[in-house]
């Protein structure tokens, strides 16, 4: 059953790949958004040289390219073939040599243990049938002292609905919603507790208020429907 659910999830994102970057929040369009993302990455990235990094659930490569621009070697993985194809197209177009993209299941990575200094994901956990197994898998491929970073949100917060076109708002997900344990998101505090339960140390989090404010302002400027999702980043380290 899990494989069938994953195929439905992959098919959904596969169809969205050609226009994924046009959807709200999937790109940086304003100086305030740029400043927010710079602060976020300054906050969560380990302060040591070039890192071997994995972007789990990379989509079309937003975080992959952000990390590469900071001098890191990055592999992006995604279960949706069209997302990987679009990420590779962008990589070739931009001439970015320090990135690679592979079609892979974030719950069952094709890498040996202790392969990376950093594993990062954005808005992925809530789409997975086995999110806790994914966290274990991400920890498995991290080196001692390596860091896990999750950027996510609580998409049912208050009266807010999920982003248009997302898995949460799509009728095709009605049949599998009960098999996605984190559908709708989890709170920052819940993810911090989850990190600790899985053995990570020096766990911390940030509510991303600057990013939320920047995106809210952009909604006003573009005449979009107002949404007030809670967003956050949580990070923790593998013990040495």
Please name every model-derived segment.
Residues 217-240:
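Core SAM-dependent methyltransferase catalytic element
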Residues 1-49, 62-66, 174, 209-211, ...:
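Conserved class I S-adenosyl-L-methionine
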Residues 132-144:
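A short glycine-rich, Lys/Arg-flanked "PGG" loop and its adjoining helix->strand segment in the class I
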Residues 123-124:
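Short catalytic micro-motifs in class I SAM-dependent methyltransferases
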Residues 120:
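A conserved beta-strand element that flanks and buttresses the S-adenosyl-L-methionine
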Residues 50-52, 114:
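Nucleotide donor/acceptor-binding cores
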Residues 7-8, 24, 151-217:
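C-terminal alpha-helical "lid/dimerization" subdomain adjacent to the S-adenosyl-L-methionine
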Residues 52-56, 60-108:
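Class I SAM-dependent methyltransferase SAM/SAH-binding core
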């Amino acid at each position: 059953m899990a494989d069938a659910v994953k195929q439905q999830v992959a098919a959904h994102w596969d169809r969205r790949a050609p226009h994924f970057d046009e959807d709200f929040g999937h790109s940086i369009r304003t100086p305030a958004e740029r400043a927010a993302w710079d602060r976020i990455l300054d906050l969560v990235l380990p302060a040591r040289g070039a890192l071997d990094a994995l972007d789990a659930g990379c989509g079309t490569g937003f975080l992959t390219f952000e990390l590469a621009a900071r001098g890191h070697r990055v592999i992006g993985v995604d279960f949706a073939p069209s997302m990987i194809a679009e990420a590779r197209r962008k990589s070739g177009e931009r001439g970015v040599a320090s990135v690679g993209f592979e079609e892979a299941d974030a719950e069952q990575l094709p890498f040996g243990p202790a392969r990376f200094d950093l594993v990062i994901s954005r808005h992925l956990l809530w789409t997975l049938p086995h999110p806790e197994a994914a966290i274990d898998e991400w920890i498995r491929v991290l080196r001692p002292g390596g860091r896990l970073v999750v950027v996510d949100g609580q998409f049912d917060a208050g009266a807010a609905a999920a982003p248009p076109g997302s898995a949460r708002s799509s009728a095709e997900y009605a049949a599998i919603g009960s098999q996605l344990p984190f559908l709708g998101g989890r709170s920052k505090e819940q993810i911090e507790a989850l990190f600790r339960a899985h053995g990570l140390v020096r766990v911390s989090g940030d509510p991303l208020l600057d990013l939320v404010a920047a995106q809210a302002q952009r909604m006003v400027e573009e005449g979009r429907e107002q949404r007030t999702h809670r967003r956050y980043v949580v990070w923790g380290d593998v013990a040495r």
